[in-house]
Regions:
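Short, acidic/polar
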Residues: 11-22, 99-111, 207-216, 267-270
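Acidic (Asp/Glu)-rich catalytic clusters
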Residues: 19-24, 46-68, 110-116, 153-161, ...
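Residues at the N-termini of beta-strands
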Residues: 29, 119, 224, 281-282
């Protein structure tokens, strides 16, 4: 496995500068944001002429690969929510937002193809996450599932044309957020290979899910991994629960995102289970830890994870007792 960096953490720096920083610390991959207006990747520009080859060559010059293109915001508005909740992503009517999100996700797949990148990470959206509870409208979740099939099925048709896979990141406020909803989504999509997951263990322990269960149940569908931790703050969780509101730096929170090794994710178990299901791609570090700087995060993360990576599989026993 390789350890990579999600460059969205460093949008105030030029991409070449970020690549130099990551490479110098021992990172081997970058995950590039693809949403409109970000300075690291302009989808329209990269699809012109030889720009994709030029960009890939620049990144490769630092000894890095591009593990994925990430487009969480624009994927979100395919299924919602709409209104002012997502005006920062794209202002407009519900129909205008769906159209924009759909077109942008297809263009992200096109750019991934041009860059030789096998996967796009992102969100699928969810118009009303509160519908996980069947009152006051018991068919609300089923309605959203049908919209998921209709809208994302068309997007995935284009992903198939471009030879790119989509890795949804299970997360609160998404139609797919846990093991059961992930398995259900595979069923809804008819098992098509373009549909899979960006496994982020922090998002799962947020909801008290054993991350090993997700790895084992979704084997063959994990196309990308985020190296992010989450801390269950034991002295607060009995008061606020796992889904507290308010500032992420608030002392009373029962949960907060952390860098790997500083939270509650069992990393030795994660890095045992992933090879067992055949995952040998990238662990992409994403900095969302509000307790420490980016410099702390980027240096501490690789120092923590690198020694945990299993370099070679078990060779078997060859003594007489095991013949």
């Amino acid at each position: 496995m390789k350890i990579g960096l999600f460059t969205a953490t460093y949008l105030d720096l030029g991409l070449a500068e970020v690549c130099k920083l990551a490479s110098g610390l021992g990172y081997q991959a970058v995950e590039l944001p693809a949403f409109a207006g970000n300075p690291h990747l302009d989808l329209d520009e990269v699809l012109k002429g030889s720009n994709a080859k030029t960009l890939a060559k620049m990144i490769g010059g630092y000894g890095l690969i591009i593990s994925a293109l990430a487009n969480h915001p624009e994927g979100q508005i395919v299924l919602g929510p709409y209104g002012k909740d997502t005006d920062a992503i794209r202002k407009g009517t519900k129909e205008e937002k769906i159209k924009f999100g759909t077109e942008r996700m297809i263009k992200t797949a096109q750019a991934a193809n041009a860059l030789g990148v096998p996967v796009v990470t992102g969100f699928v959206g969810c118009e009303n996450f509160g519908r996980f509870f069947p009152w006051p409208y018991s068919k609300g979740w089923a309605d959203m599932e049908q919209e998921f099939v209709e809208r994302w099925g068309k997007i995935l048709d284009k992903f198939a044309e471009y030879g790119v896979k989509f890795a949804h990141e299970p997360h609160p406020n998404e139609l797919v957020y846990d093991v059961d909803s992930a398995l259900r989504s595979v069923e809804l999509m008819g098992g098509r290979k373009e549909w899979g997951f960006n496994f982020d263990p922090a998002n799962l322990i947020y909801l008290d899910i054993h991350v090993e269960n997700f790895i084992d149940q979704l084997k063959g569908r994990i196309y990308h991994v985020h190296a992010k931790d989450g801390e269950v703050v034991e002295h607060n969780v009995k008061r606020s629960g796992r889904i507290p509101q308010g500032d992420w730096q608030r002392l009373g929170r029962g949960f907060r995102f952390r860098i790997p090794g500083w939270g509650s994710v069992p990393w030795k178990k994660v890095l045992t289970e992933l090879p067992l299901i055949g995952y040998d791609y990238v662990l992409s570090y994403e900095h969302e830890d509000v307790t420490m700087s980016r410099h702390d995060g980027i240096t501490k993360t690789i120092a923590y994870l690198q020694p945990l990576l299993i370099e070679k599989p078990y060779e078997g026993r060859h003594d007489v007792l095991f013949q």
